[in-house]
Amino acid sequence: IAQINPKMPRTHGDGLIDVNQINYAVEVNDEIPELPIIDLSEQELAIGKNCAALIENGATLQMGIGAIPNAVLVALQNHQNLGVHTEMFSDGLINLLETGVVNGKLKKVHPNKVVASFTVGTRKLYDYIDDNPEIVLLDVAYVNDPSVIRRNPKVTAINSAIEVDLTGQVCADSIGTRLYSGVGGQMDFIRGASVSEGGKPIIALPSITGKGESKIVSFLKEGAGVVTTRAHAHYIVTEYGAAHLYGKTLRQRAKALIEIAHPEHRERLEMEAFERFKTLN
């Protein structure tokens, strides 16, 4: 059974269906649900700038969903020859494509194309991808395959977190035992980026919650799910900077993460880290 809607964008890729596969068709003329663009806060813009500083010219980008990935895209106006291989295509990419910042010419897999598995955004986005051969939407099982992801150069995967502990464990799907969201493709792209030549897996998050609680914590909440293990954590970014964790001891990691925590929480985190590790040297 097929629903035919002229307001639905026609996308290139492997989503085409042969008319002979359709038994029944229903015609509608409904508006497509939109995700409005929200103004970015100074905190989010700072996080985006810190992430952008880690992104090299010629990198292949994967961005998660939300304000922080959009803030990263805003900060990439002066980059060159970027490519995109991502789970989700969002409004923030349009300007980078129109200005040539994103052209995909250095990609090894699907060069000169933006590869994604789904898209959500405004009507402008849907109109942009409509019958646009530069945008290719492919099966998520292929797009998120680490063995495919790694083949592109300098894959830089930017994903979010709910909280990160002082050893680098990343919780991204729950608040304690309460599920908050799905894990999405975080594990796939963090791994794919880590084995890409010159790749950089990045976890980006605000230093505090809206209630002022630190999102960098000594221990994850009881029952919290670890989506990215500390063995796979490379870069953690907040509005206060970036901590490079890969190859460092747990003590060195704790010290680096405290340096990018909110200033109001650093002294307490230092005391808790010292209690746990006895030294931060």
Residue ranges and their predicted role:
Residues 1-281:
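Conserved phosphate- and dinucleotide-binding cores of soluble alpha/beta proteins
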